[in-house]
């Protein structure tokens, strides 16, 4: 059985073949409505919303390494509004971590704090790597990992509930799980 996302991306017309090469990797414009990093049959779809960013780079790291082995700038053609999206082919999700660098205006009064030298964690990351010991202050940048969706939705239809009808409860996991009870 395929998960909902696996079925969506396998039926998606963009999940086909590369159109260009960036930093030695075959690429094509991505699937803009899949936030974060989503594994596809032949590659990985990377999508990030920058809210005012003027350029974006995808950084690929070997696991547990601080320096990227590849930097892939998103072409302007791979941007719609504030969303950058690119499919990168030939990646084994078990062998790398990723992060972004985003450039744009620096204007704290307007809440714009872009710095093209800062490495940013994907806000949609499904797994975060970097801190090896829990509770110890980490002085390095966190990286994201790509995770396969292993949940089997079967024939269950997607929820038709309106966002205004949902109740979302956020839980601070560490405090909730810290006590042995």
Can you say where each PLM-predicted feature lies in the sequence?
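Short proline/glycine-enriched turn/loop motifs at strand-loop junctions of beta-rich domains
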Residues: 49-55
């Amino acid at each position: 059985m395929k998960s909902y996302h696996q079925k969506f991306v396998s039926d998606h017309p963009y999940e086909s073949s590369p159109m260009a090469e960036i930093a030695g990797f075959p690429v094509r414009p991505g699937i803009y409505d899949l936030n974060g990093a989503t594994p596809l049959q032949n590659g990985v779809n990377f999508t990030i919303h920058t809210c005012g960013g003027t350029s974006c780079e995808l950084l690929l790291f070997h696991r547990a390494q601080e320096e990227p082995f590849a930097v892939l700038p998103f072409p302007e053609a791979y941007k719609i509004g504030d969303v950058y999206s690119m499919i990168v082919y030939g990646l084994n999700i078990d062998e790398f971590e990723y992060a972004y660098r985003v450039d744009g205006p620096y204007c704290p009064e307007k809440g714009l704090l872009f710095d093209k030298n800062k490495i940013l964690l994907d806000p949609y990351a499904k797994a975060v790597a970097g801190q090896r010991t829990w509770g110890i202050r980490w002085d390095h940048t966190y990286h994201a990992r790509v995770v396969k969706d292993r949940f089997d939705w079967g024939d269950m239809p997607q929820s038709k509930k309106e966002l205004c009808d949902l109740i979302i409860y956020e839980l601070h996991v560490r405090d909730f799980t810290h006590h042995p009870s």
